[in-house]
C-alpha cells in the first residue's frame, strides 16, 4: 500500500493507483518547506495527536482504529494543528486547547466552548478555549512533523487571521452540531480561520500517512 497525506478521510491508496484529483491524492512532500520563522507571516504546525500525553494519544489510537475498521482501511497517524502568526506588533500562537486553569487572560483566550455536550460544558474539565496568545507557546512543538509550513508572507492576511479568531464558531467539540458532515474540533478551528482569511485551506496537506479529523468541517462552515 502506498500512503498519502489526506485530511479527513483515508490515508492510503493501493500501490500504483492514481488519485481521483481530490486533495490529498498525492505523494509529494512539496508542502514541507524550510521557512524563516522570524519573518512576518503565518506558519502552520502539525502535532501528533496527544503529543506529550499518553492518555490522549492512546484514546486517539483507539478512535482511529475503530474509524479505520468501519471505513475498511488501515489506521492513519492523527494530527492536531496550530498556527503561529507574526506581525509588526508581535508573535501570536493560535490554537484550540483544553482549559487548564482560570488564567485564560494570560494565554490570550478569546472564547470557550463545550466538550462532548453542552450540559457537560458547565464544568471546566469539559470546556475548550480558543487562544490568540501573544508571545505564547505551543506545547510539545518539538514533536511537530513536517513543520512549520509557511502559508503566507502577506501582512494583511496575517492581521486578518488575528482579527477573525474571536469570530470562530464554538460548537460542541467532538460533535457535528454545524451539520458539516464530521465532528468539530481543533482542526476545524484552524481550517475555518485559514479559509475565512482568503487562503486556500483545501490545498493544505497533513504529513505523509496522516489524517486531520475535523479539517473539512471548518472549511464547510467557513463557506457559509
Residue locations for each model-derived region?
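Short helix-capping/linker segments at secondary-structure and domain boundaries
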Residues: 88-91, 195-203
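Residue-identity detector for glycine
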Residues: 8, 16-24
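Active-site nucleophilic cysteine motif
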Residues: 78, 175-197
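Short terminal or interdomain "cap/linker" segment that borders an active site or interface and mediates
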Residues: 207-224
Amino acid at each position: 500500500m502506498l500512503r498519502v497525506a489526506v485530511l479527513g478521510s483515508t490515508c492510503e491508496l493501493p500501490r500504483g493507483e492514481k488519485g481521483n484529483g481530490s486533495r490529498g491524492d498525492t505523494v509529494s512532500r512539496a508542502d514541507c518547506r524550510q521557512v524563516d520563522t522570524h519573518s512576518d507571516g503565518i506558519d502552520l504546525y502539525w502535532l501528533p495527536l496527544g503529543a506529550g500525553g499518553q492518555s490522549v494519544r492512546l484514546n486517539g489510537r483507539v478512535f482511529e482504529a475503530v474509524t479505520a475498521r468501519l471505513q475498511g482501511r488501515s489506521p492513519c497517524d492523527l494530527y492536531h494543528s496550530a498556527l503561529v502568526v507574526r506581525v509588526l506588533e508581535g508573535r501570536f500562537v493560535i490554537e484550540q486547547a483544553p482549559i487548564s486553569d482560570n488564567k485564560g487572560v494570560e494565554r490570550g483566550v478569546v472564547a470557550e466552548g463545550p466538550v462532548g455536550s453542552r450540559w457537560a460544558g458547565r464544568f471546566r474539565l469539559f470546556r475548550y478555549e480558543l487562544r490568540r496568545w501573544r508571545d505564547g507557546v505551543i506545547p510539545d512543538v518539538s514533536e511537530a512533523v513536517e513543520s512549520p509550513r509557511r502559508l503566507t508572507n502577506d501582512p494583511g492576511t496575517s492581521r486578518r487571521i488575528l482579527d477573525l479568531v474571536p469570530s470562530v464558531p464554538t460548537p460542541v467539540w467532538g460533535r457535528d452540531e454545524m451539520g458539516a458532515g464530521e465532528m468539530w474540533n481543533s482542526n476545524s478551528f484552524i481550517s475555518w480561520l485559514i479559509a475565512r482569511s482568503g487562503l486556500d485551506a483545501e490545498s493544505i496537506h497533513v504529513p505523509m500517512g496522516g489524517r486531520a479529523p475535523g479539517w473539512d468541517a471548518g472549511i464547510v462552515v467557513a463557506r457559509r
